[in-house]
């Protein structure tokens, strides 16, 4: 508790002063998959103070909806991938289900490759038929290697093709420190980083249909023949947890990727190389609490006097409506939203032709005099330049309206 109080004190005192340097890039759109560029390094926070007492060799704490890195320790250090690889298999599965190419009720015929898997397993027999849903359960809660192999083969057509898709998807997400050599993550050569795992979790967290499986504590598959026990103890000990995966090995130590929601915030904690499972769980809870207690989501509010319409000169219409663009929720130190100020600038007029989305002004949000978010004020639709025929029509209309 002394360590936690010290950490909270340091963070709360420093958060307002240092927050602005971590503001998100200008004009970045909120929609779409988060990439490596979306994660802003926590380089302005005294990391050594924040991570004091952690046994983890590497760690990352992010707010997933904004991509803001809150705390980090050696985030790019490569480590054994292990069961984290199964999160990528789950992501590929979720995307196939979302596109309609796969359903929970579809069945997979267990191959010799899947049957040959060692370690954590649900004891699948060669030629056995098992549903996609049961395979998802076995991978989400049970870390089953045979279940993962069978699921990967169902999704990609073969284990080799699955590895190709896994590496391709990792590249798309900006997981530059990750390499998959097999679909289960158990072979030599599978590597990842804490930062990459946070990127993967942020993408996987979008698929809410998987949450019941990722948060399941105990379950069975194969008509009760195989019992599943989730190594992520936070699914039953931390309120608001939404997944993801815990595992360990002699070489890697105890590792966890845990996600949780509280209010508007969705936080991911990744800890690699903890000294023990007990340390891993304690430190994950500590960092989740620290994130929720220290930060909050701020949704930009528009000033009441913001210009909503602008005159168009020489256009088929006399004016065009305006709207803000490029504004999205951001992370700020908790309790500082009253310090946020907003101002805007706008042109007096636009000359036709006006393009849809044409810039007519700027809007910015500041805290303590520093810009934390910037956007544009743009035209809501196209306005064509007035021609002779249009001019005659308007003249006649105005005469008839007199």
Show which residues each predicted segment covers:
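Gram-positive cell-envelope targeting signals
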Residues: 1-33, 388, 392-402
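A generic local structural motif
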Residues: 2, 45-47, 255
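Hydrophobic alpha-helical segments, especially transmembrane helices
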Residues: 6-7, 87, 262
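Sterically constrained small-residue positions within well-ordered secondary structures
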Residues: 18, 50-52, 260, 353-354
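Residues in and immediately flanking transmembrane alpha helices
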Residues: 18-19, 99, 299-302
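Active-site-adjacent loops and short helices of periplasmic peptidoglycan-processing enzymes
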Residues: 25-195, 202-208
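Domain-terminus/edge residues, biased toward the C-terminal soluble/receptor-binding domains
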Residues: 175-179, 187-402
